[in-house]
Amino acid sequence: MTGNLKLFELKKLEDTRMKIVIINGSARKGNTLTAINAFIKGASEKNEIEIIEPDKLNIAPCRGCGVCQCSKGCVDKDDTNPTIDKIAAADMILFATPVYWWGMSAQLKLVIDKCYCRGLQLKNKKVGTIVVGGSPVDSIQYELIDKQFDCMAKYLSWDMLFNKSYYATARDEHEKNKYSMNELEGI
């Protein structure tokens, strides 16, 4: 496991009720969902939590048409605008993804791309990431994903509270790692 925690900021989270939106970038009910559930176990008592599951939504890829910059959201008649409304209303966003080809999943990237339609409404959020992959956590894949989120955080003035990376190759392997489960519950 790797990552940093802003302990002062996390202490402040304990004192404030927040609306947390979790974007589950995994289509499977495996190690990424296990990590999400551990986080929820620790955070749900004091916060309102909603999970967005992109694989269950009808969201078309961004066309890059730019119309959204002159109107109130994406022109696609799909689940984009209601999904982005939920993200924009959140105090904290948790991005969770398995590693696919040294990057985040297509499901998560699709939602992030569609956030372009209301990027300014996503400024100044508290953010965390959970990344689960099949290589040891000192592998370049986690660093690449963390750097991508760090760039987004800088651009949108996000307060990046934590980047957590976990190694799990077999289904349900993450659940057996008591240290990481306790760590996620403690965030």
Predicted feature descriptions by range:
Residues L122-N163:
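Short, glycine-/small-residue-rich phosphate/pyrophosphate-handling segment
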Residues T2-A96, W102-R118, K154-T169, E173-I187:
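N-terminal beta1-alpha1-beta2 submodule of the flavodoxin-like/Rossmannoid cofactor-binding fold
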